[in-house]
Amino acid sequence: MDVVARFMVSYSGTACAISLFIFGITLLFPFHKSQSFVCMNSHSWDIFRNKAKREFESNAEKLIKDALRKGLTAFQLVTNMGTYLILADQYAEELRNDKRLSAYDALNDVILLELPGLETMFQGSLHNHVSPTAIHAMNRELVHLTRALSDEANHRLQTQWTDSSEWHTVSIHDTVLALVAQMTTRAFVGAELCRNAEWLDIAINFTINRAIAVQAVQAWPWILQPVVHWFLPTCKAVRRQIQRARTILMPVLERERQTMHRKDSSSDRIFSTLTFIDQYAQGSRYDATMAQLRLTAVSVLTTSDMVEKVLARICEHPELIQPLREEVVSVFESSGLHHKSLLKLTLMESVMKESQRLEPATLISMFRAAKKTVTLQDGTTIPKGTRLAFANDLRLDPELYPDPETFDGYRFERMRKDPEQAKLAPFTKTRTSHLAFGHGKHACPGRFLSCDEAKLILCHILLKYDFKALDGRVPDLHVRSMFIQRDTGGMLSVRRRQEEVTL
């Protein structure tokens, strides 16, 4: 999923969080009609579009497929937060770097960014680009973070799953969320807070609470929103959570500043976005706490969603467990625990990418806002002010993916052996037929950290535990609105095993 769409939905527990965020990002603005597009869920006399919104909520996937079957390459959909334009993936390459389409403007003013407690995007030149810059810097440092991330995966997994050699039951959702939160916190704010229970609770729940607050505010007329948020309990709760985050984080940052200024400060200190952003600011005024909450918001829940889906697929196809385990043993026996070792886990990447192909976070991808009117090469015109997204349809194209509805864990492994397709097989590689991370200059910059975290989690699980779906029941897959999600109540039966190699 790209920069704009780093949130995915969850209608139980974690969920309402991300769903609302993506809705807010892309769907609130009205559609400007300078070209007529077919609307797939418009109805006569549906003045307030309530029927259309209900239809989208329950049948978005069918509406999109029906439009594509009719040969439509551009069409409208009414959602419960506005009307937007859906483009077929064939246009993604043409538009992927078009400066007239803005990822940032797809956020601006939509998710109440200027209300106190909700301003995770900030204002001003520094805040508008500091977080993506920090992520790009972190990507360059991932080679040095592998051991630290692995240590946190080991610690959390031992805490959650224990060393018991007897079969026992654990929650997939709770396990993965805790793992990703701890590992991501290690990369973002360093060792001091990555095992701090209170900070980890904030890292997991801030996005959820913020989304609930936005939903509560948006239930009021827009003219009252700048006032009503002061009185809504949900908004008050978010502001309290932010204040608590400041109380925890700022002393850590101050100690980091003092360490960095000491003459004996080690030059091989492990990277964190906390210190990077502080140095990047060069004394400019900025909100360090909100910067970290923003990074966390676009990282923890999305990565967790992806890993949960991969684990569910492996449980559906237990025949993959031994080949995956053998690959992990072979790679780490010969290469040790290094970032380059993770790149050699090609079967694991194939399983991850195939899972993501069939179960992306959202049905549609690459959310954008048109700053100017855009005319495509085939004459299709996108009016200025349009909020749009791509249909994510090529991921199920039988000409590109034989038997596209069937999960094939070896699909992208085989692709690596084809010289014409090998470069498109890696998990982090974007392409028009695989838009889960977006495509072009706004493709998700955090996908490299997400990939490394997912691999390390799977490596530790495969080496240290036997696991299977509880009573053979794999978490159900749900599609609601534009969001694709596994049931968060899924359980695993696990037991400790003797690993062949130690990470």
Curated annotation (Swiss-Prot):
Enzyme Commission code(s) on record: 1.-.-.-
GO biological process terms on file: mycotoxin biosynthetic process
Practical use: The indole alkaloid meleagrin was shown to be a good candidate to control c-Met-dependent breast cancer proliferation, migration and invasion.
Family that this chain belongs to: Belongs to the cytochrome P450 family.
Subcellular location: Membrane
Coiled coil, from the record: none
Transmembrane segments: 11-31
The gene coding this protein: roqO
Function of the protein: Cytochrome P450 monooxygenase; part of the gene cluster that mediates the biosynthesis of the mycotoxin meleagrin. The first stage is catalyzed by the dipeptide synthase roqA which condenses histidine and tryptophan to produce histidyltryptophanyldiketopiperazine (HTD). HTD is then converted to roquefortine C through two possible pathways. In the first pathway, prenyltransferase roqD transforms HTD to the intermediate roquefortine D, which is in turn converted to roquefortine C by the cytochrome P450 monooxygenase roqR.
Gene null: resulting phenotype: Impairs the production of glandicoline B and meleagrin.
Keywords: Glycoprotein, Heme, Iron, Membrane, Metal-binding, Monooxygenase, Oxidoreductase, Transmembrane, Transmembrane helix
Descriptive protein name: Cytochrome P450 monooxygenase roqO
Cofactors required: heme
GO molecular function, one term: iron ion binding
Induction behaviour: Expression is decreased in presence of phenylacetic acid (PAA).
Pathway membership: Alkaloid biosynthesis
Residue numbers binding heme: 444
Residues annotated as glycosylated: 205
Enzyme class: oxidoreductase
One Gene Ontology cellular component annotation held by this UniProt entry: membrane
Membrane topology category: Single-pass membrane protein
Keyword match Membrane: yes
Cited InterPro entries: Cyt_P450 (IPR001128), Cyt_P450_CS (IPR017972), Cyt_P450_E_grp-IV (IPR002403), Cyt_P450_sf (IPR036396)
Transmembrane helix listed as a keyword: yes
Principal localisation: membrane
PROSITE patterns for the chain: CYTOCHROME_P450
One matching Pfam family: p450
